[in-house]
Amino acid sequence: MSAAPAPAPAAAAPRALPSRLSQFYALTKPRVVQLIVFCAFIGMVLAVPGMPSGAQWALMAVASAGIWLVAGAAAAFNCIVEQGIDAKMKRTAWRPTAKGELSNTQTLLFSALLCAAGSALLYWWVNPLTMWLTFATFVGYAVIYTVILKPLTPQNIVIGGASGAMPPVLGWAAMTGEVGPEALILFLIIFLWTPPHFWALALYRVEDYRKSGLPMLPVTHGNEFTRLQVFLYTLILFAGCLMPFVYGMSSWIYLAAAVVLSAGFCLYGFRLWRDYSDTLARKTFRFSLIHLSLLFAALLVDHYLL
């Protein structure tokens, strides 16, 4: 009796395309980009008095898609530059470029395609100002921060945080064709939020960063100094989060949420400074994400209720 024939190699083919697509999708750092688009969307909504019209909702959708594409392009370019660093760090070793699953040429072409598509979408269907601001953000993150600042100085997060704080400005520009003071207040909040957010991560990932050779603050200045900086920045951030109410762009609903959320972040910062543990640093990092998401959600609720 003859043996059963071996399965044909072609049987694995249907899984190849989905696997390759998932690798390209991973390059865009989806969770990070989702937060970017969310913050940009909040900027869009706040820029429109009252309930948006159908045409304005359509404009928001197109602008969000364009910003998503360019943000994904910046993330993919970052994966090329930091391929060697990512391979040394447990947190990033899974990335397709770090594992050698995608070549630099493939990743660069993918990044260029996303950037070109997003820029064209923003230029022709939104407005040129939004396109140029979004492209400047791409350059700020992918080149100035990733290539120059990140390997050069422990203040990389502080200076480079400007590019990460741009999403609400992009959203505001998409709907109004200008950058108003309200957009700059939203920019300030994210700019002040960025250092304690990333330094909390760097504290419990310090060995990863030490192996990578990046001059993150816990590596260059030590654990205790970084913990103090996290706490001090949460205090400064508290003041910054009050600015929408002080300027008159929100009411007591946002104010109450800002006080509670910012006080919680300050408490985490204080506890981290006084009694450090990796577990607490991880909780502080996670709370920072909750803080920003709920803070901007409170702005949205406040905008429509009062």
Swiss-Prot record:
The similarity comment for this entry is: Belongs to the UbiA prenyltransferase family. Protoheme IX farnesyltransferase subfamily.
Q: What is its EC number?
A: 2.5.1.141
- Role description: Converts heme B (protoheme IX) to heme O by substitution of the vinyl group on carbon 2 of heme B porphyrin ring with a hydroxyethyl farnesyl side group.
PROSITE patterns named among the record's database cross-references: UBIA
The species this protein was found in:
Acidovorax ebreus (strain TPSY)
Q: What else is known?
A: Carbon 2 of the heme B porphyrin ring is defined according to the Fischer nomenclature.
Keyword annotations for this protein, in alphabetical order, are: Cell inner membrane, Cell membrane, Heme biosynthesis, Membrane, Transferase, Transmembrane, Transmembrane helix
Keyword Cell inner membrane annotated: yes
Q: What residue intervals traverse the membrane? A: 32-52, 57-77, 108-128, 129-149, 157-177, 183-203, 230-250, 252-272, 285-305
Pathway listed for it?
Answer: Porphyrin-containing compound metabolism; heme O biosynthesis; heme O from protoheme: step 1/1
Entry GO MF terms: protoheme IX farnesyltransferase activity
Membrane topology per the entry is:
Multi-pass membrane protein
Primary enzyme class: transferase
Q: Where does this protein reside within or beyond the cell?
A: Cell inner membrane
Its recorded name reads Protoheme IX farnesyltransferase
State the GO CC annotations: plasma membrane
Name a single GO biological process.
heme O biosynthetic process
User: What reaction is this protein's catalytic activity?
Assistant: heme b + (2E,6E)-farnesyl diphosphate + H2O = Fe(II)-heme o + diphosphate
Instruction: State if Membrane is listed as a keyword.
Output: yes
